[in-house]
Structures are given as structure tokens and as C-alpha cells.
């Protein structure tokens, strides 16, 4: 018999201790991984709801199971809010992740072996944009494009590659690029060779929703995103489009269900719905503006302290520190900062001499610290402490001093007040 008072702590203390340990880690560590954020208690309430019990294969009004009258309302709310927030006229809220959303787009629009132009993973792209170890690189003929010597997307290179290889699809979007993308220019290049323009805006979706970063939806044939990262919702994916016909949208829907997924996760879709509503609030815009300000403030400190930032700055929520000149590996920098309770991720930099398992850089993002309430002053202090650690990654006494400062500021700015 199920009872509402059942809990994990009493039944499975081994698991509960690990879960509580993660709560403490999040409260006592500064989170700078660009793809991570703190979701709201409302989203977590949705994800822990009885919606998790409901199977709902199909789409609202066209289900393969009975008893879907309430989950239809939930999914339709998420669809309508996604369309309103991003100016789309099509939305699919069922993908379990950004990678699943991307896989569905490939499946809908391409045949195995088709040529695709995607951003090189080593220069800022994503695994699903054609990395040889990913399904995208295994199933399709990938032609990578990259950045120029100034660290900016090389549109001339994209245009030349497109003209030469005649791709069926060009992918815009990134996982480690700190500049703005000219979506109109990307569409112009795609149109010149009759290719689809597919944009993966996962990293900057929250900034786009708030009008802080250019919106690709009016320019692309199809757009995907995650619902976490800057959007600060549950872990999941979305597919959006504007200006397509019903046949095009039917292809996209079919590629999600039944093409690549079965039943949707209705508890997660409820979390997406509430996160999309939160993203429509005026304070969400203020939050995203602060995300950009904090990233810029941190870049200023790193540059002043003699550190190299790829492309020399940032126009979004993230930036890459290039540590080649400092002769520090990304792996060692990541570990040293971790000992000071500062969490980053090692990341390859353009023309990186080291392997992807070691790297010569770290990726830094401001969404999570901004969610805690950090403003420019705190962001600058934090960047200074990071420089103190990186100036001598073997000075354990100094790392311990920085750790104490981190613990103090974390107590002052709790994740969940």
C-alpha cells in the first residue's frame, strides 16, 4: 500500500546521504559550468508530481492511451508558451534532451550519408553537430567549419565550404562560443545552396527569451534547445519552427514520436510549462541582462590579470580561458579550482596541443552565480580569486584561503533562500 508519508531518508539512507551530499555541494560550491543552472522549486514540484505515473504516447488530442484529458492540458500549455516566448508557430515539447531533439531533426530532414556543415567541436561546436564519436558524425557526411584568428565565426569559410560541398543542412549554434551569431547571414548562406538551416540555441535560449541575444527562430528552418542551461527549467529538449508548412511540422513530430521516442515524460513537460511561464516574467529579463554583465565583468578581471580569453571577450553567458601560454592544463586548472570549491570544466581551445581529456583551457559561465544573486562586484571578486588559484595551482595554503572566501560568499548568497 502506498502512503504519502513514505520517504527516501527512512527507507534508503545510503541513497539519501548521497542526495543530501549533493545539496550541500551545491550550496557550498560556486557553480561556473556554463551549461548548469539552478531550477526553481516550482519546476521541482512538477517533476516530483503524480504526472510521472501517466503514459501519453502521441500528441494532445491524438493519444494512444485513455485518461489523457489532464496531461493534454499540461502539454498544450507548454507548447503554447514555447511558441509565444520564442515567436514560433510550431513547438514540440516532448524531446527528453537537447541531443534527442537534435537527433529528431536529423531524422526528419536527412537520409544517412547526407552532407552536413557543422561547427567543429574543438572550436566551439557540440557533439551532436558532427563529432566523429557521436551518431551525427557516424551517420552523416560532416564537413566542419570553425572560427577565424580573432576567435569569431568565419562566415566566409562557411560560405566557401557550402559552395564546395553542397550540404543538405547547415547547423548554427555552439557549446563553447562566446560571440554573437549572425543568423540572417547563416540563412543567406543556406539558401544560396538550397540547404536547411538548423540552429541549436541550447546554450543561449534563456538570453534569447529575454531579448538579450539574437533570436534565430525567424531565420532558421528549425531550431532546437534544451530547457535547462540559461532557460533554467528541467532537463529536457524543445523543437521550434516558424514559417514552415504542415507537412514539414508533421515530419518533425513523427521524428520525435514514434521515430525516436515512445511515451513523453509528462512530469518533465509540466516542469517545462512552468519554467516557460517563469521566463515570461519581467524579472527573468533582468536576470538574463545580469548574466551577460557578470560574464563581461569576469572577463575584464582575467584580461587585467594577464590571462588570455578566446575571442578577447564575451557577448553571452560564457567564455573560454586559454591557458596554453601559462603552461597549465585544463585538467589541472579544473582540479585546483575544485579544491577551492569553484566548479568549472576543462575545455579544448582553438588549435589545442593537448588531448580532449587533458585540454589547455577552461570554460566559464555566469548563469548559476547570477541565479544566486551575484552582481558585477561579486563576479569580479570571484574572478580575482580564480586568478589567485591559477597563478600557482600548487599553493595549497592559498587554495585553502580562497576556499574560505568561497564558503563565506556562498553562505551570503544561498541557492535556495
Swiss-Prot record:
Entry protein name: Serine hydroxymethyltransferase
EC number(s) given by UniProt: 2.1.2.1
Family from the record: Belongs to the SHMT family.
Gene Ontology MF annotations: glycine hydroxymethyltransferase activity; pyridoxal phosphate binding
Source organism, top-level taxon: Bacteria
Localization: Cytoplasm
GO biological process, one term: glycine biosynthetic process from serine
Function per UniProt: Catalyzes the reversible interconversion of serine and glycine with tetrahydrofolate (THF) serving as the one-carbon carrier. This reaction serves as the major source of one-carbon groups required for the biosynthesis of purines, thymidylate, methionine, and other important biomolecules. Also exhibits THF-independent aldolase activity toward beta-hydroxyamino acids, producing glycine and aldehydes, via a retro-aldol mechanism.
Primary localisation category: cytoplasm
Cofactor: pyridoxal 5'-phosphate
Annotated metabolic or biological route of this protein: One-carbon metabolism; tetrahydrofolate interconversion; Amino-acid biosynthesis; glycine biosynthesis; glycine from L-serine: step 1/1
UniProt cross-references to Pfam families, sorted A to Z: SHMT (PF00464)
Keywords: Amino-acid biosynthesis, Cytoplasm, One-carbon metabolism, Pyridoxal phosphate, Transferase
Keyword flag Amino-acid biosynthesis: yes
Residues given in the record as (6S)-5,6,7,8-tetrahydrofolate binding sites: 121, 125-127, 355-357
Subunit organization: Homodimer.
Catalytically driven reaction(s): (6R)-5,10-methylene-5,6,7,8-tetrahydrofolate + glycine + H2O = (6S)-5,6,7,8-tetrahydrofolate + L-serine
Site (Plays an important role in substrate specificity): 228
GO cellular component: cytosol
N6-(pyridoxal phosphate)lysine modified-residue sites: 229
Amino acid at each position: 500500500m502506498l502512503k504519502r508519508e513514505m520517504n527516501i531518508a527512512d527507507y534508503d539512507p545510503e541513497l539519501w546521504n548521497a542526495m543530501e551530499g549533493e545539496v550541500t555541494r551545491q550550496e557550498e560550491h560556486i557553480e561556473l559550468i556554463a551549461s548548469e543552472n539552478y531550477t526553481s522549486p516550482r519546476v521541482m514540484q512538477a517533476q516530483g508530481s503524480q504526472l510521472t505515473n501517466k503514459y501519453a504516447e502521441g500528441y494532445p488530442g491524438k493519444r494512444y492511451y485513455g485518461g489523457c484529458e489532464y496531461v493534454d492540458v499540461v502539454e498544450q500549455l507548454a507548447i503554447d508558451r514555447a511558441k509565444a516566448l520564442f515567436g514560433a508557430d510550431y513547438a514540440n515539447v516532448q524531446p527528453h534532451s537537447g541531443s534527442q531533439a537534435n537527433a529528431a531533426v536529423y531524422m526528419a530532414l536527412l537520409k544517412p550519408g547526407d552532407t552536413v556543415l557543422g561547427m567543429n567541436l574543438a572550436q566551439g561546436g557540440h557533439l551532436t553537430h558532427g563529432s566523429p564519436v557521436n551518431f551525427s558524425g557516424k551517420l552523416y557526411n560532416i564537413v566542419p567549419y570553425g572560427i577565424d584568428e580573432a576567435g569569431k565565426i568565419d562566415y566566409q569559410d562557411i560560405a566557401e565550404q557550402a559552395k564546395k560541398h553542397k550540404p543538405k543542412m547547415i547547423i548554427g549554434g555552439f557549446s563553447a562560443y562566446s560571440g554573437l551569431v549572425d543568423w540572417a547571414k547563416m540563412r543567406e548562406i543556406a539558401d544560396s545552396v538550397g540547404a536547411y538551416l538548423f540552429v541549436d540555441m541550447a546554450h543561449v535560449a534563456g538570453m534569447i527569451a529575454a531579448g538579450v541575444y539574437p533570436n534565430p527562430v525567424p531565420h532558421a528552418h528549425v531550431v532546437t534547445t534544451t530547457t535547462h542551461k540559461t532557460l533554467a527549467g528541467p532537463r529536457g529538449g524543445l523543437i521550434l519552427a516558424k514559417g514552415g508548412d504542415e507537412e514539414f511540422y508533421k515530419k518533425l513530430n513523427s521524428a520525435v514520436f514514434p521515430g525516436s521516442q515512445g511515451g513523453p515524460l509528462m512530469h518533465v513537460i509540466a516542469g517545462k510549462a512552468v519554467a516557460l511561464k517563469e521566463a515570461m516574467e519581467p524579472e527573468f529579463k533582468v536576470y538574463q541582462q545580469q548574466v551577460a554583465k557578470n560574464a563581461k565583468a569576469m572577463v575584464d578581471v582575467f584580461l587585467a590579470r594577464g590571462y588570455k580569453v578566446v575571442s578577447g571577450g564575451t557577448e553571452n553567458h560564457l567564455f573560454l580561458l586559454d591557458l596554453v601560454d601559462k603552461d597549465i592544463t585544463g585538467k589541472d586548472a579544473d582540479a585546483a579550482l575544485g579544491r577551492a570549491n569553484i566548479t568549472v570544466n576543462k575545455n579544448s581551445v582553438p588549435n589545442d596541443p593537448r588531448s580532449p581529456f587533458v585540454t589547455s583551457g577552461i570554460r566559464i559561465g555566469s548563469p548559476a552565480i547570477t541565479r544566486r544573486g551575484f552582481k558585477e562586484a561579486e563576479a569580479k571578486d570571484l574572478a580575482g580569486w580564480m586568478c589567485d588559484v591559477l597563478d600557482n595551482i600548487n599553493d595549497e595554503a592559498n587554495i585553502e584561503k580562497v576556499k574560505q572566501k568561497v564558503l563565506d560568499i556562498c553562505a551570503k548568497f544561498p541557492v535556495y533562500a
